[in-house]
């Protein structure tokens, strides 16, 4: 039986307000709004339109902050995040296809 706190274990649960997310990451709220506007980190919205961030989104925002701290403009950091996401998806697809090709015996033909 799922309890009311189980959602907090979900990395996609939108538990953080913009202010709290900014505080946790050590960034300004404007930085998070810029990531949202650029499409790099799209928080969920409440019925009233307020942003709510998940732990997974905080990790993406932290990576964007790391890239900006390295000297990349925000737009470049957003593009890098998108490319890293694409690469991860392609790697997962490649791994799945290799497993399928290997078949039940673990060897390819």
Predicted regions and their residues:
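Arg/Lys-rich, alpha-helical DNA-contact motif
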Residues: 2-14, 23, 37, 42-43, ...
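Ser/Thr-centric signal marking residues that sit
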Residues: 17-18, 46
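Residues within the helices of the helix-turn-helix
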Residues: 18-19, 33
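Short coil turns linking two alpha-helices in DNA-binding domains
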Residues: 28-31
